[in-house]
Amino acid sequence: MGSNDPSTPSKASKPPEQEQPPATTSGTTAPVYPEWPGFQGYPAMPPHGFFPPPVAAGQAHPYMWGPQHMVPPYGTPPPPYMMYPPGTVYAHPTAPGVHPFHYPMQTNGNLEPAGAQGAAPGAAETNGKNEPGKTSGPSANGVTSNSESGSDSESEGSDANSQNDSHSKENDVNENGSAQNGVSHSSSHGTFNKPMPLVPVQSGAVIGVAGPATNLNIGMDYWGATGSSPVPAMRGKVPSGSARGEQWDERELKKQKRKLSNRESARRSRLRKQAECEELGQRAEALKSENSSLRIELDRIKKEYEELLSKNTSLKAKLGESGGGGGSDAVPDMNERGDTNGGSHQKEP
C-alpha cells in the first residue's frame, strides 16, 4: 500500500504504532474524539488548494459587539474584532485549509512543537501545496499533505502517524503554555468544542419544569412529608383537546339552558297576555250586548212615553171640550174628584 520511499520513515512503523494504545500521561490531555477518523475520510484525490485573500478586511466595526455573522465560512479568517462563544459548530470542509489564529479551532490533539511557534501560522500551507521533495509538518486537522506527485496512501499513512504522535507532543505544548495558533489550550476547550446534540421537540409537547403538587396543604406538612407523595405532581400543560371540548360542551349546555329558560319565560308571558286579551274581548262583547239590550229597552220606553204623551193630549182635548159644553157645575166636581184621587185629572168613563 503505497511506495517504499525512504523520505517517509514513519510508514515502516505504521502497523505497530496503530496497534499500541495511546500513551497516558499524568497531566491533563485534550480528549480524543472517537468519531474523528470518520471525519478524516477524504475522497481519493489530492486536496484542493487554498488561496487566502491578499487584501485584508477594511476598517473594523466601530463597536465591539457590532452585527456579525453566526459562523463564518470554514477556513475564512474572521476580522480581529469578532468574538465567538466556545462550542460553535463549523461545517466539515472537503479539504484541509488554513485556520485563523484569532480563536482556537477544534483539533484531535495534534499540535505543533514549540520550535515552530515563532513561524507564521499556515505559512507552509498558504498555497495548499509543499515544495517538491519536502514533507509537510502536521496541520491543524492532523492531515499531512505530500508533494503534488505523492499518492493517497502516503497521505493516509502520515495521518495515522500524526494522530498517534499527538499524545506525546501535547504535554510539552501544555508545559510551554502555548499552542499552535498562539492561544493556550486546556482540557476544557475539548468539552467546549464538542457539538451539542439537538433534541427533537414535539409540536404538542410543552417544555417546562414540573411544579409542586397543587393542594391546599402547601407548607403545612413540610418536615413530615415523605419522599413519595400520594398526590401526583401536576405539570403545567396546555389543556388537551378533550378538556377543551368538555369546557366547550359545558358552555354550550349553559347557553342552551339559558336559551330554553328565556324561551319558556317568553312563552308564559305571551300566554298570559293572550289570556288577558281574550278576557278583555269577552268583557267587551258582554258590554256590547248589554248596551244593545239597554238601547232596546230605552227605545221601548221612549215609545211608551210617546204613546202616553199622545193619550194625555187627547184626554186634555176631550176634557176641554167636555168642560166647555156641560156648564160650570161639572168643573168643580172634576176638581174634587181629582183632589180626592191624588191630583189626577183623568175622567172616569
From Swiss-Prot:
Per the record, where are the segments of Low complexity compositional bias? 113-124
Subunit: Binds DNA as a dimer.
Q: Which Gene3D superfamilies would you find in this protein's record?
A: 1.20.5.170
Q: Recorded GO terms, molecular function?
A: DNA-binding transcription factor activity; sequence-specific DNA binding; transcription cis-regulatory region binding
Q: Where is the composition biased (Basic and acidic residues)?
A: 261-277, 334-349
Protein name, entry field: Transcription factor HBP-1a
Q: What does this protein's UniProt record list under function? A: Binds to the hexamer motif 5'-ACGTCA-3' of histone gene promoters.
The record ties this protein, via SUPFAM superfamilies, to: Leucine zipper domain
